[in-house]
Amino acid sequence: MASMQHFSLAALLLAASICLGDADRTECQLPLDKGTPCTQEGGVKPSVAWWHDDKSGICLSFKYTGCGGNANRFTTIKNCEQHCKMPDRGACALGKKPAEDSNGEQLVCAGMREDKCPNGYQCKMMAFMGLCCPTKEEELFAREYEGVCKSGKPVKMDRGSGWMMTILGKSCDDQFCPEDAKCERGKLFANCCK
């Protein structure tokens, strides 16, 4: 009985931390705002910054023009991820709903045991459990997140959070690619190609 009380208390604390954690992260839901060019002499020069795209659930790069903008702007991808991506939260790619049982409850799966998921769904592990997510969207998101260059050239990588990662943005209009790379638009994201 005591272990059940401990489990209930832990679940309550986790739920509270998730709810309270989201309450002070409203800036992460703001749309991209590139700001405006600074007109004052000695103003901030344009630079690459990151914003949290609430729809995709990831941090994307863009060219910040130097002045103004909103609070959904971070100087590094690491800062963006630490502030906006809850490590104990998870969701299916592109905001798609996980599979549900006949009672409307989300189907829970474990690891690579996709036999627990209906056809067209795959097990996606979250922090504490797995959900059955639509396979088509999960595969598209994974492919796009790694970056694809239609030109056949390699994707430009950067040491963003301490490891090599693809430089991604929402659109080539966001002008986030370094000078030695060309932006190419994919189905979901834009990435930099060598």
From Swiss-Prot:
Q: Keywords, A to Z?
A: Allergen, Disulfide bond, Protease inhibitor, Secreted, Serine protease inhibitor, Signal
Q: Is Disulfide bond included in the keywords of this UniProt record?
A: yes
Q: Which GO terms describe its cellular component?
A: extracellular region
Annotated GO molecular function terms are: serine-type endopeptidase inhibitor activity
Could you say which residues form the signal peptide? 1-23
What are the disulfide bonds? C28-C84, C38-C67, C59-C80
List the subcellular locations: Secreted
BPTI/Kunitz inhibitor domain mapped to chain residues: 28-84
Q: Which PROSITE patterns match?
A: BPTI_KUNITZ_1 (PS00280), BPTI_KUNITZ_2 (PS50279)
**UniProt domain WR1: residue ranges:** 90-134
Which Gene3D superfamilies does the annotation name? Pancreatic trypsin inhibitor Kunitz domain (4.10.410.10)
Q: Which InterPro entries match?
A: BPTI/Kunitz_domain, Cys_repeat_1, Kunitz_BPTI, Kunitz_BPTI_sf, Lustrin_cystein, Prtase_inh_Kunz-CS
Protein name listed in UniProt: Major allergen Ani s 1
Could you read off the lineage of the organism from its UniProt record? Eukaryota, Metazoa, Ecdysozoa, Nematoda, Chromadorea
